[in-house]
Amino acid sequence: MEDRLHMDNGLVPQKIVSVHLQDSTLKEVKDQVSNKQAQILEPKPEPSLEIKPEQDGMEHVGRDDPKALGEEPKQRRGSASGSEPAGDSDRGGGPVEHYHLHLSSCHECLELENSTIESVKFASAENIPDLPYDYSSSLESVADETSPEREGRRVNLTGKAPNILLYVGSDSQEALGRFHEVRSVLADCVDIDSYILYHLLEDSALRDPWTDNCLLLVIATRESIPEDLYQKFMAYLSQGGKVLGLSSSFTFGGFQVTSKGALHKTVQNLVFSKADQSEVKLSVLSSGCRYQEGPVRLSPGRLQGHLENEDKDRMIVHVPFGTRGGEAVLCQVHLELPPSSNIVQTPEDFNLLKSSNFRRYEVLREILTTLGLSCDMKQVPALTPLYLLSAAEEIRDPLMQWLGKHVDSEGEIKSGQLSLRFVSSYVSEVEITPSCIPVVTNMEAFSSEHFNLEIYRQNLQTKQLGKVILFAEVTPTTMRLLDGLMFQTPQEMGLIVIAARQTEGKGRGGNVWLSPVGCALSTLLISIPLRSQLGQRIPFVQHLMSVAVVEAVRSIPEYQDINLRVKWPNDIYYSDLMKIGGVLVNSTLMGETFYILIGCGFNVTNSNPTICINDLITEYNKQHKAELKPLRADYLIARVVTVLEKLIKEFQDKGPNSVLPLYYRYWVHSGQQVHLGSAEGPKVSIVGLDDSGFLQVHQEGGEVVTVHPDGNSFDMLRNLILPKRR
């Protein structure tokens, strides 16, 4: 064993002595490590010079001698080469020196280095060929400052630790804010269970041996990069490193960063060429700079991006470097900034950027994939039990009595595809499957960060609807959970299913409904007599639910100008620009009663990859210097159900004309001209809804045509009414 280990001076130990580590000490250190969240390597770097964004402020900051910088390092780790990472060079020694030993696969040594080992250094993976690589020994100061949880991390094929290092310039509040912005967008693109994102400060970048344990270096600062740090970054590239530059002064390979005042903080149209030569067009926020080729050129890589303007300004370049696979993708558009950034000044710019937000993520993922990272969809979360909750205390006892009479001998209520097993408590050993889900009846055991029962109770002002709640953190789809209950439960119990996430959400025509955390997801059970105003006009149900969502937000005092709209037949929109939610209705006629499941989902807090209600509130506050508070999903679901019950009552009492004025106030189609069937189809003008809830359009010849929502869809981008794909 001794001859497989090396110490700092290159010697091998004569003897290995086992040391007993006390469990109490180990647990204390692990607890301290796990409680840290910020991935900061060093506290205070040296300040750097900042490059001004004026016309000449970034002229010719490219390095025009890549040959001198791109040479392969000739000396191995431990040499005194100036191109080697700082901290890896030979250290001077006196007559008495202490050299420290570390086995690469030893977690205890890493996590106890402060209390047990004076200074742990890396054991070379090359010198321990048949021991497993352990990336937990990535930086000597990690255990001192912060150390992420290491369980379940995926080892990548490069043999390097899965570290993504973010360099954002000098140590300042502005830089810290930039770090959080960049970290947030990268965490949305890659699997954070497979990669660790660190804040790389200047002192640490110069001193620590990070280059051997870095999969990707992200440089996101407009400040000039000190020469010694620049050389460090180039040495990393020459060793096969990968670099992503985000609106940064960093460049090489004959490319120069030059400023162009007309582009500064403006929204431009970008044409991005992917590795397969396909193109993506999107609106982007320009940094005010562009890339120009200098006298020395390198062959460009597979990715390119230019503005759709007369000069076709180069904004994204892909530059290979060296002979060991080093490469960089450098950008002068703000892919790291959300549309809600303070840099975005006007509502028009916000709309353009939000409309391209999904494509912004598409471009980022393409870049990260090209640089060797995995941007696969995150693992589907495990299903969780349902909790049976009640919004009114007086309904709890009758509910439990009803359940006692209707469950079978195994405590289950079964439908064709699903069994609900009612239990007083849940233990994690019980398997949860899409076909068998436990329902916990003990309300005292319930707690969730995504659903506050008290907030829901306070804002639910109904006589029947939404009184009994089935809540799940993660469930396949809320639409199936009431199959075995919808024909049996008394009307006064008002069943609703609410979920924080769905793994198999459904939309119209079998479309998949993406349901991340931050959506308000619910399925509500209502019953409508066949021989009633609404029973004779069932298509109106989806319209009532859509308008209930909009009214639930816009009827809040001071929120009346939040630009939520309804789009025929079943969507909730931001203005006429972007979908923010939708409604799905399934109805079954049994005897003289329609039993209707209304599925509804709309984005409340999840800004990415598209848009959410709180984005609209943030933008409204910015434009009007207001201080409207962000909203919660549980709060809004309660308000939606309350508004819906009121609309149903008005409809039943007075017919469709009692609710149509509210519907028309919020819908996006008034006077709109569209084509039926295809772009070559007949041109018509939208009139409104007929007495049955179907869309009426006026043809040029004078004929009024009715379009049924079941089987047709409205394409807002092309002004078409098309058959719904199935």
From Swiss-Prot:
InterPro entries: aa-tRNA-synth_II/BPL/LPL (IPR045864), Biotin_CoA_COase_ligase (IPR004408), BPL_C (IPR003142), BPL_LPL_catalytic (IPR004143). The keyword Nucleotide-binding applies. Pfam families: BPL_C, BPL_LplA_LipB. Changing E42D: In HLCS deficiency; benign; conserves enzymatic wild-type activity. Keywords: ATP-binding, Cytoplasm, Disease variant, Ligase, Mitochondrion, Multifunctional enzyme, Nucleotide-binding, Phosphoprotein. Changing N511K: In HLCS deficiency. Residues 463-652 form the BPL/LPL catalytic domain. The modification Phosphoserine is found at S147, S299. Widely expressed. Mostly expressed in muscle, placenta and to a lower extent in the brain, kidney, pancreas, liver and lung. GO terms for biological process: biotin metabolic process; post-translational protein modification; response to biotin. Transmembrane segments: none annotated. It catalyses: apo-[methylmalonyl-CoA:pyruvate carboxytransferase] + biotin + ATP = holo-[methylmalonyl-CoA:pyruvate carboxytransferase] + AMP + diphosphate + H(+); apo-[propionyl-CoA:carbon-dioxide ligase (ADP-forming)] + biotin + ATP = holo-[propionyl-CoA:carbon-dioxide ligase (ADP-forming)] + AMP + diphosphate + H(+); apo-[3-methylcrotonoyl-CoA:carbon-dioxide ligase (ADP-forming)] + biotin + ATP = holo-[3-methylcrotonoyl-CoA:carbon-dioxide ligase (ADP-forming)] + AMP + diphosphate + H(+); biotin + L-lysyl-[protein] + ATP = N(6)-biotinyl-L-lysyl-[protein] + AMP + diphosphate + H(+). Changing Y456C: In HLCS deficiency; 0.2% activity. Changing R508W: In HLCS deficiency. Changing D715G: In HLCS deficiency. Residues 28-98 are annotated as: Disordered. GO terms for cellular component: chromatin; cytoplasm; cytosol; mitochondrion; nuclear lamina; nuclear matrix. It is linked to Holocarboxylase synthetase deficiency: A neonatal form of multiple carboxylase deficiency, an autosomal recessive disorder of biotin metabolism, characterized by ketoacidosis, hyperammonemia, excretion of abnormal organic acid metabolites, and dermatitis. In holocarboxylase synthetase deficiency, clinical and biochemical symptoms improve dramatically with administration of biotin. Belongs to the biotin--protein ligase family. Biotin--protein ligase catalyzing the biotinylation of the 4 biotin-dependent carboxylases acetyl-CoA-carboxylase, pyruvate carboxylase, propionyl-CoA carboxylase, and methylcrotonyl-CoA carboxylase. Monomer. This is Biotin--protein ligase.
